[in-house]
């Protein structure tokens, strides 16, 4: 039976289980035209571990992460934003049995409510991210 998120989640509460492919301190390229080019993941929204306190938080496709801009426009650098993971290299399995893996990792910068800051998304976007975040689906040109 699929699990459904609690009140802490932002966006659509239903969450597919996706194998985490992006972890703390990962450098990830940005797939939109918000002005940021490269970000570092500094947190995963909604992640907690009751049993293992040393576990490094991981995020998969469709998860919201907290990032700091490392490369991009000077007014955006060193600023903290939230972002949605739209692609990951690590393979994950869909409920129909197919395995999906992209050739790069990518995030889209969003507001705390989940609305994208940019007006277009470059490259393909995973179906799991578009089902959980409908506003990202509106900007996506290719949905895989």
From Swiss-Prot:
Keywords: Ribonucleoprotein, Ribosomal protein, RNA-binding, rRNA-binding. The keyword RNA-binding applies. Belongs to the universal ribosomal protein uL14 family. InterPro entries: Ribosomal_uL14, Ribosomal_uL14_arc, Ribosomal_uL14_CS, Ribosomal_uL14_sf. GO terms for cellular component: cytosolic large ribosomal subunit. Part of the 50S ribosomal subunit. Forms a cluster with proteins L3 and L24e, part of which may contact the 16S rRNA in 2 intersubunit bridges. PANTHER family: 50S/60S RIBOSOMAL PROTEIN L14/L23, LARGE RIBOSOMAL SUBUNIT PROTEIN UL14. Binds to 23S rRNA. Forms part of two intersubunit bridges in the 70S ribosome. It comes from Pyrobaculum islandicum (strain DSM 4184 / JCM 9189 / GEO3). The keyword RNA-binding applies. GO terms for biological process: translation. GO terms for molecular function: large ribosomal subunit rRNA binding; structural constituent of ribosome. The gene is rpl14. It holds the Pfam family Ribosomal_L14. This is Large ribosomal subunit protein uL14. Transmembrane segments: none annotated.
